Amino acid sequence: MRKNRALKRTVLPDPVFNNTLVTRIINVIMKDGKKGLAQRILYGAFEIIEKRTNQQPLTVFEKAVDNVMPRLELKVRRIAGSNYQVPTEVPPDRRIALALRWIVIFANKRNEKTMLERVANEIIDAFNNTGASVKKKDDTHKMAEANKAFAHMRW
């Protein structure tokens, strides 16, 4: 076990939008340390979003992330030899992390040709409260609602 809790690293805002949330999704998109490629993908997706919605891409993105953020999640708790899925509230930082991760995961699973289009369409779908990432949030909430009886086992 570690002696002290690991400190949270500060995330610097990105150079174009001067926003830390944009930097965080760039870091989620990034593979093998190729940050420049991840930035090109996201900024290209933002251009597509601006063309399709005629709105500021940053506001669309922030609303999309807000629509995907889960309030509750299930944690497995072992009590007297049996496992229970206990619904717990998600901390604010983890809410954002899960939302960004789900947007990128479900963007990857889409059928569009380029990653730019996939990310753009997933963000637009999340903005409109449709799409796979919003469905994932709804499924998580349904599971938490179904296991509400075990909520008293929180720790």
Swiss-Prot record:
InterPro entries the UniProt entry points to: Ribosomal_uS7, Ribosomal_uS7_bac/org-type, Ribosomal_uS7_CS, Ribosomal_uS7_dom, Ribosomal_uS7_dom_sf
Family annotation (CDD domains): uS7_Bacteria (cd14869)
GO molecular function, one term: rRNA binding
Pfam family, one: Ribosomal_S7
GO CC annotation, single: ribosome
PROSITE patterns assigned: RIBOSOMAL_S7
Key word RNA-binding present: yes
Protein keywords: Ribonucleoprotein, Ribosomal protein, RNA-binding, rRNA-binding, tRNA-binding
Keyword Iron found: no
Gene Ontology annotations of biological process type: ribosomal small subunit assembly; translation
Family as reported in the entry's similarity comment: Belongs to the universal ribosomal protein uS7 family.
Functional summary from the UniProt entry: One of the primary rRNA binding proteins, it binds directly to 16S rRNA where it nucleates assembly of the head domain of the 30S subunit. Is located at the subunit interface close to the decoding center, probably blocks exit of the E-site tRNA.
Subunit structure: Part of the 30S ribosomal subunit. Contacts proteins S9 and S11.
PANTHER family: RIBOSOMAL PROTEIN S7 (PTHR11205)
Protein name from the UniProt record: Small ribosomal subunit protein uS7
Species, as recorded: Mycoplasma genitalium (strain ATCC 33530 / DSM 19775 / NCTC 10195 / G37)
Taxonomic lineage of the native organism: Bacteria, Bacillati, Mycoplasmatota, Mycoplasmoidales, Mycoplasmoidaceae
